[in-house]
């Protein structure tokens, strides 16, 4: 049997090289490859191209949408910043108006209080002066009566004459006023 294997190997070795393929096999493989390439180029590649184009378009559309959204967000941010700046300026203006109005109200109240104080003081001075005049008149009549009575006792005669009594009282009061004026100086 060993002989048989060796002889078969020597016969086949002379006829074909295992590294060089058979021509018919190579032709069949090339025809199969050509058919496969035709199918791939005709059907598969266009589907891949279509899918690739759709995905590229979707990606570019997504990028465009993202850029548009980013631009819109930036515009909204700028608008909000402007509104915030305007609101702060408005708040400052309102605060300054309120401060000025408060100062005006305070000044008005101070002026009213000063006027009221002056009026009350003037009324008090008038009331005091009125009471002083009433007191002076009352005191003159009482002092006159007392002076007449006292003078009558001192002199020893009654001063029943009204004119004489009035002169005595007036002279007494004039002396009293000059003494009080001299003491006040």
UniProtKB/Swiss-Prot annotation:
Pfam family of this protein, just one?
ATP-synt_B
Major subcellular site: membrane
Gene3D superfamilies, alphabetized: F1F0 ATP synthase subunit B, membrane domain
GO molecular function (one) = proton-transporting ATPase activity, rotational mechanism
User: InterPro entries in the record, alphabetically?
Assistant: ATP_synth_B-like_membr_sf, ATP_synth_b/b'su_bac/chlpt, ATP_synth_F0_bsu_bac, ATP_synthase_B_chain
Tell me which SUPFAM superfamilies the record gives. Answer: F1F0 ATP synthase subunit B, membrane domain
Membrane topology (UniProt): Single-pass membrane protein
Bilayer-crossing residues are: 28-48
CC terms in the record's Gene Ontology section = plasma membrane; proton-transporting ATP synthase complex
* Protein keywords: ATP synthesis, Cell membrane, CF(0), Hydrogen ion transport, Ion transport, Membrane, Transmembrane, Transmembrane helix, Transport
- Give the superkingdom in one word: Bacteria
Localization per record = Cell membrane
Query: According to its UniProt entry, what is the function of this protein?
Result: F(1)F(0) ATP synthase produces ATP from ADP in the presence of a proton or sodium gradient. F-type ATPases consist of two structural domains, F(1) containing the extramembraneous catalytic core and F(0) containing the membrane proton channel, linked together by a central stalk and a peripheral stalk. During catalysis, ATP synthesis in the catalytic domain of F(1) is coupled via a rotary mechanism of the central stalk subunits to proton translocation. Component of the F(0) channel, it forms part of the peripheral stalk, linking F(1) to F(0).
Q: Which family does it belong to?
A: Belongs to the ATPase B chain family.
HAMAP family, alphabetized: ATP_synth_b_bprime
Subunit structure of this entry? F-type ATPases have 2 components, F(1) - the catalytic core - and F(0) - the membrane proton channel. F(1) has five subunits: alpha(3), beta(3), gamma(1), delta(1), epsilon(1). F(0) has three main subunits: a(1), b(2) and c(10-14). The alpha and beta chains form an alternating ring which encloses part of the gamma chain. F(1) is attached to F(0) by a central stalk formed by the gamma and epsilon chains, while a peripheral stalk is formed by the delta and b chains.
Q: What is this protein called?
A: ATP synthase subunit b
**From which organism does this entry originate?**
Paenarthrobacter aurescens (strain TC1)
* Upper taxonomic lineage: Bacteria, Bacillati, Actinomycetota, Actinomycetes, Micrococcales
**What gene is this protein translated from?**
atpF
């Amino acid at each position: 049997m060993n002989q048989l294997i060796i002889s078969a190997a020597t016969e086949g070795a002379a006829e074909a090289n295992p590294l060089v393929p058979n021509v018919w096999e190579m032709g069949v493989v090339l025809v199969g490859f050509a058919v496969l390439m035709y199918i791939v180029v005709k059907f598969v590649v266009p589907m891949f191209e279509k899918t690739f184009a759709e995905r590229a378009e979707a990606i570019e559309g997504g990028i465009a949408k993202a850029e548009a959204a980013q631009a819109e967000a930036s515009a909204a941010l700028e608008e909000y910043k402007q509104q915030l700046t305007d609101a702060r300026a408005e708040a400052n203006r309102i605060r300054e108006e309120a401060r000025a109005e408060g100062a005006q109200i305070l000044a008005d109240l101070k002026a009213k209080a000063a006027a009221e104080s002056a009026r009350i003081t003037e009324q008090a001075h008038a009331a005091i002066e009125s009471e002083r005049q009433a007191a002076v008149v009352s005191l003159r009549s009482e002092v006159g009566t007392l002076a007449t009575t006292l003078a009558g006792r001192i002199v020893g005669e009654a001063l029943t004459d009204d004119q004489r009594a009035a002169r005595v009282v007036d002279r007494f009061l004039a002396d009293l006023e000059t003494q009080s004026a001299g003491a006040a100086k």
